[in-house]
């Protein structure tokens, strides 16, 4: 497809060939735009290309962790499990690209190292790692909210003689860890997924934990023909549920009852009956678990008791389980458990408390030293999380009309308009950027891309050359996001270094990164913005 804008190579350039890149290709191509999506990886898949660690799987249930623009694709693709692994999820994306003939619009093995808005020309120029340049009218980030890893500053990291890497950079050629001694720094969702798999063949697995997590059961199960038929017969309703749910998921909530108003025995019965896996337990039991501190305490104590039941050693159980007094449920994102807690019942799986008992001192040639002990390892994995929401956008210079980079603009406050555009960055969109909701990502991605496409269609229809995000609109959205955040229990996240507030980063302080007013409310705001002609933006013709 030729570009409608003769002065540029493409109407739109997107960065990132995961769900966002695929959605971008579909919707912009339908709108008649010439689009090219670049990715530094050798295959499509986004986070599922990079996170190759053993046990990597989705935490959203498969049948709504997908794009919904085609009813045919929803019917033709068959998931095999409740929570698909990395390979199956990536295969799904390849299926979408194949069926929709998206490959001609994707350029792999191409890292973008610079993006700059050229004010005189009124368009963007992107530069690749080989020095090649491309121009576009619209520059769009689909790089994802958890794609840039946090690498902790630990003394001696360059001294270790064995493999040492971040979990999201697990060797693509594979790694033989059978019979090896493995040390894992970090105890979040990645570690919860890795440990049960590694423990099957490793000589030993030692986890160095700073903050314990509220851990919910995954309760993985195979997709049966009967279950698949039920899903495919009801996909319209499933898509509608995701669009209207507070976290973009196909859950039956709200349920019309509150924990604080329910008698103790009845409350316990409801908690027990719904202990069937996934985040459903949080949303399909009571409506006040994330809003009312007392209800949250009840839920937290139930989870803590359930966790301790599965660990034979009470001392280890106490280390693994958080305390409500330290932080409430969902101040940190709870991982889903595929056998993590039970792994500590094995003699060769060890937990080390590095917050209160034996802090890390340094990495040595042969392992790791704490204030109390020395540990020898063959492999060290940094499961230390990501620079959420802003990290990928700050990883290389993205320079707007003021000459300022995004990294410079966001040094103290990460501001945006609905997570999709940023003042002083004309004709640039960010898919699920900072101050977008924390929700089922494919749902949020599609809602963002629909808004972006409608904006571009308006500009092309009306002959507009530029949109400029209004500074007052950015300030208003940032203030609204901060006000809502302050009223939630998630505001406690800075106390436990939650990545949802960027508190896990050493280069920046905690900040409000997520809109917690509800995904459905946010999607409504996007629709209202488009229906009203995008009042958050100023349009220009040159």
Descriptions of predicted regions:
Residues 179-181, 354-355:
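Short, basic, glycine/proline-bearing loop/turn elements
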Residues 2-12, 17-157, 173, 187, ...:
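N-terminal FAD-binding dinucleotide-binding subdomain shared by FAD-dependent oxidases/monooxygenases
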Residues 197:
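Active-site-proximal cofactor/substrate-binding loop regions of enzyme domains
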Residues 175, 182-185:
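A conserved hydrophobic secondary-structure block that centers on an alpha-helix together
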Residues 170:
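Short, acidic/glycine-rich phosphate-metal binding loop used to engage nucleotide
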Residues 178-180, 322-323:
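Short, surface-exposed connector motifs at secondary-structure boundaries
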